[in-house]
Swiss-Prot record:
Pathway(s) where this gene product acts: Cofactor biosynthesis; ubiquinone biosynthesis
Cross-referenced SUPFAM superfamilies: Chorismate lyase-like (SSF64288)
Record protein name field: Probable chorismate pyruvate-lyase 2
Organism per entry: Pseudomonas fluorescens (strain Pf0-1)
Keyword Lyase: yes
Enzyme Commission numbers on file: 4.1.3.40
Cellular component terms per the entry's GO annotation: cytosol
Subcellular localization, as worded in the UniProt entry: Cytoplasm
Function: Removes the pyruvyl group from chorismate, with concomitant aromatization of the ring, to provide 4-hydroxybenzoate (4HB) for the ubiquinone pathway.
Catalytic activity: chorismate = 4-hydroxybenzoate + pyruvate
C-alpha cells in the first residue's frame, strides 16, 4: 500500500509527457551521478550527510526492495553538493537483514559518496531507473518545492539490495544552464 500522496515511479517507456532533452538525459543517465556532478563542479563536489539510521521504510521502498510493508532498514539521506550548493537530495535505503548478512557498512560512509562505492564494486547490478515528481513533503525543509524530478534505482549484490533515490534540486538545473560544456 502506498502512503497518501506517494509518487508513482515510472520507467522511461511509461513517461508521458516527456521532460525536455537535458532533464531526460540527467534522469536516465546510467553512469555515476557522483562522477557527473564532480565534472560539472570542476571537482568542487562534496557530500553532506543529513540523516543516517534505522527507520521503518516507506511502503514504496518496501515494494521496490521486495520487503513486507513496515520493514525496518538503514536510511541514509544526504545532499550532493557542487561548490557548497545543494544540487541533489539523495535517499538510500537497505533492509536490516540484508545489510547484516552482507557486510556493507553504510553506517561508515560519512561524507563519502555511496554512489562511488556502488559503481566501483562491479558485483552490484543496477536495475532499471524509475522517475517521478518527488513529493514535496518528503524533502528536507530547506529544499521543499513542488514538481521536482526524482529518480531511483535498485542495486543488487547477492542477497543485498540498496535502493537509491536522487532528487534534482533547482540549483542543479541552474548550474547545468551556466556550464553546458561540463554536462
Amino acid at each position: 500500500m502506498q502512503h497518501t500522496n506517494a509518487p508513482l515511479w515510472r520507467p522511461q517507456s511509461e513517461l508521458t509527457p516527456l521532460p525536455d532533452t537535458s532533464t531526460l538525459d540527467w534522469l536516465f543517465d546510467e553512469g555515476s551521478l557522483t562522477r557527473r556532478l564532480t565534472h560539472l563542479s570542476d571537482d568542487g563536489f562534496s557530500v553532506t550527510p543529513l540523516f543516517e539510521g534505522w527507520q521503518t521504510l516507506r511502503d514504496d521502498e518496501c515494494a521496490a526492495l521486495d520487503l513486507a510493508e513496515g520493514s525496518e532498514g538503514w536510511v541514509r539521506e544526504v545532499y550532493l553538493r557542487g561548490h557548497g550548493q545543494a544540487w541533489v537530495f539523495a535517499r538510500s535505503v537497505a533492509s536490516r537483514s540484508a545489510l547484516q548478512g552482507d557486510g556493507l557498512h553504510m553506517d561508515e560512509l560519512g561524507s563519502r559518496s555511496l554512489g562511488e562505492l556502488l559503481f566501483c564494486d562491479h558485483a552490484f547490478q543496477r536495475r532499471a531507473i524509475e522517475v517521478c515528481h518527488y513529493p514535496e513533503h518528503w524533502l528536507p525543509e530547506g529544499s521543499r518545492a513542488a514538481g521536482l524530478w526524482g529518480r531511483r534505482s535498485r542495486f543488487d549484490r547477492g542477497a543485498l539490495s540498496v535502493l537509491v533515490a536522487e532528487i534534482f534540486l533547482p540549483t542543479l538545473w541552474e548550474a547545468v544552464r551556466a556550464r553546458p560544456e561540463n554536462c
